C-alpha cells in the first residue's frame, strides 16, 4: 500500500483517483502531479514502482500544502478574521453562514437544530 502525505492510498484504484484521498488534492491537482512526474494516470496504485511513489511524494511535498499543513493554515485564516473583526470573522464567531446565504429560513446546518420558542398565547375574552 502506497503512503503519501500520511494517507494510505487504496490499492485497487487508479492513481489519478487515489491521489484525491489526500486532503488538498482534487482531480485537477492530481492530473497536474501525474503529468509533472511522468506517471501514467491509468496505473493502479498496486502497480506503482517504488521510484514512482518517491517521485510523487517529493513533487507533492515540494509544490502543495496538503493534509495537516493545509488544515492548520485554514484554521489560522479563520482565527485571524475573527480577531480583526471583519464581517466574515463575525459570521464565523456567531456560527452563521459566511458567504452571504439567507438565514431567515434555512441555514440549519450552520445554526444547528431549531430551538423551541413559546408560541403566541390567545388573548382571553374581557
Curated annotation (Swiss-Prot):
Coiled coil: none annotated. GO terms for molecular function: rRNA binding; structural constituent of ribosome; tRNA binding. Pfam families: Ribosomal_S13 (PF00416). Gene3D superfamilies: 1.10.8.50, 30s ribosomal protein s13, domain 2 (4.10.910.10). One of its GO terms (cellular component) is small ribosomal subunit. It comes from Frankia alni (strain DSM 45986 / CECT 9034 / ACN14a). Residues 96-126 are annotated as: Disordered. Keywords: Ribonucleoprotein, Ribosomal protein, RNA-binding, rRNA-binding, tRNA-binding. GO terms for biological process: translation. This is Small ribosomal subunit protein uS13. InterPro entries: Rbsml_uS13_C (IPR027437), Ribosomal_uS13 (IPR001892), Ribosomal_uS13-like_H2TH (IPR010979), Ribosomal_uS13_bac-type (IPR019980), Ribosomal_uS13_CS (IPR018269). Located at the top of the head of the 30S subunit, it contacts several helices of the 16S rRNA. In the 70S ribosome it contacts the 23S rRNA (bridge B1a) and protein L5 of the 50S subunit (bridge B1b), connecting the 2 subunits; these bridges are implicated in subunit movement. Contacts the tRNAs in the A and P-sites.
Amino acid at each position: 500500500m502506497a503512503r503519501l502525505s500520511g494517507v494510505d492510498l487504496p490499492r485497487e484504484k487508479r492513481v489519478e483517483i487515489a491521489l484525491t484521498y489526500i486532503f488538498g488534492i482534487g482531480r485537477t491537482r492530481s492530473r497536474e502531479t501525474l503529468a509533472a512526474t511522468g506517471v501514467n494516470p491509468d496505473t493502479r496504485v498496486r502497480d506503482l514502482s517504488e521510484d514512482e511513489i518517491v517521485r510523487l511524494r517529493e513533487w507533492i511535498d515540494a509544490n502543495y500544502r496538503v493534509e495537516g499543513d493545509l488544515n492548520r493554515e485554514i484554521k489560522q485564516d479563520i482565527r485571524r478574521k475573527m480577531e480583526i473583526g471583519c464581517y466574515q470573522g463575525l459570521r464565523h464567531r456567531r456560527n452563521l453562514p459566511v458567504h452571504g446565504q439567507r438565514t431567515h429560513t434555512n441555514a440549519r446546518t450552520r445554526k444547528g437544530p431549531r430551538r423551541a420558542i413559546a408560541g403566541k398565547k390567545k388573548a382571553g375574552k374581557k
